[in-house]
UniProtKB/Swiss-Prot annotation:
Gene Ontology CC, one term: plasma membrane
E.C. number(s) listed in UniProt: 7.2.2.20
Protein name: Zinc import ATP-binding protein ZnuC
UniProt enzyme class: translocase
A Pfam family: ABC_tran
Subcellular location(s) per record: Cell inner membrane
Taxonomic source organism: Pseudomonas fluorescens (strain ATCC BAA-477 / NRRL B-23932 / Pf-5)
GO molecular function annotations of the record: ABC-type zinc transporter activity; ATP binding; ATP hydrolysis activity
InterPro entries per the UniProt record, alphabetical: AAA+_ATPase, ABC_transporter-like_ATP-bd, ABC_transporter-like_CS, Metal_Ion_Import_ABC, P-loop_NTPase
Originating gene: znuC
Length: 261
């Protein structure tokens, strides 16, 4: 753990008397990709805010490597359509960035052709790459990517996942990625953490990229994708709380992959 870039210990967050996060244990090391998945309302955004230092947890602690450089890619960006803002001007909002640095970052993510385009005119996939380029301009040790493939088709998702992996390899940075997709995640993910206010389960995604049916479904992009099968031994009610007495009559029991309780 001494090599960790960031470490969360028993983190809990409460809003209006409701537990949004409870007893969260999480760490990210250099070169490690951790994918955080879970349904809407699971606390993923709250956890990201805690990681970024935008929110102080009510219980537990968040430790960061001293002077840690973080590159953050938001889930989406809304720009007023009447605002005259080119991609270059947007990237130059990062201190110390000139056209040369902006172009280099865009080339790294395969989006150099949009440098002079208005941000309102580029496609969703191009915007995701621009946001990723902006995160890279901070020369991050930790990349925090909030829904980096949102609004992108499966082929585009595979391309972005492959790009993120190459960036990790090139820069040696840790990656914390958030996803709403409960079953389809990066095959190069080192750890998948399933969150529903607490850590329901975590583990390595099963490598299914060689399965004929998977290859047929996703074609040449299959190696960049993987299915993660969840092994929960409990249920949640409509409010996200653990159901301690399911209909079967069995009590709530945590398995070996469950990181709480």
């Amino acid at each position: 753990m001494s090599n960790a870039l960031i470490r969360l210990e028993q983190v809990g967050v409460t809003f209006a008397g409701q537990n949004v996060l409870e007893n969260i244990q999480l760490s990210v090391e250099p070169g490690q990709i951790v994918t955080l998945i879970g349904p809407n309302g699971a606390g993923k955004t709250t956890l990201v805010r805690a990681v970024l230092g935008l929110l102080k947890p009510d219980t537990g602690s968040v430790w960061r490597k001293p002077k840690l450089r973080v590159g953050y890619m938001p889930q989406k960006l809304h720009v007023d359509p009447t605002l005259p803002l080119s991609v270059l001007r947007f990237l130059r909002l990062v201190p110390g960035v000139d056209r040369t640095r902006a172009l280099a970052a865009l080339k790294e993510v395969g989006a150099e052709q949009v440098i002079d385009s208005p941000v309102q005119s580029i496609s969703g996939g191009e915007m995701q790459r621009v946001l990723l380029a902006r995160a890279l301009l901070r020369e991050p040790e930790l990349l925090v990517l909030d829904e980096p493939v949102q609004g992108v088709d499966v082929a585009g998702q595979a391309e972005l996942y492959s790009l993120i992996t190459r960036l990790r390899d090139r820069h040696g940075c840790g990656v914390l990625m958030v996803s709403h997709d409960l079953h389809l995640v990066m095959s190069t993910t080192d750890q998948v953490v399933c969150l529903n206010r607490h850590v329901c389960c975590s583990g390595h995604p099963e490598q299914v990229s060689g399965d004929p049916a998977f290859v047929e479904l996703f074609g040449k992009n299959a190696p960049s994708l993987a299915i993660y099968h969840h092994h929960h031994d409990h249920a949640h009610d409509l409010h996200g709380s653990v159901v301690t007495q399911p209909a079967s009559g069995h009590a709530h029991v945590h398995g070996e992959n469950c990181k709480h309780g």
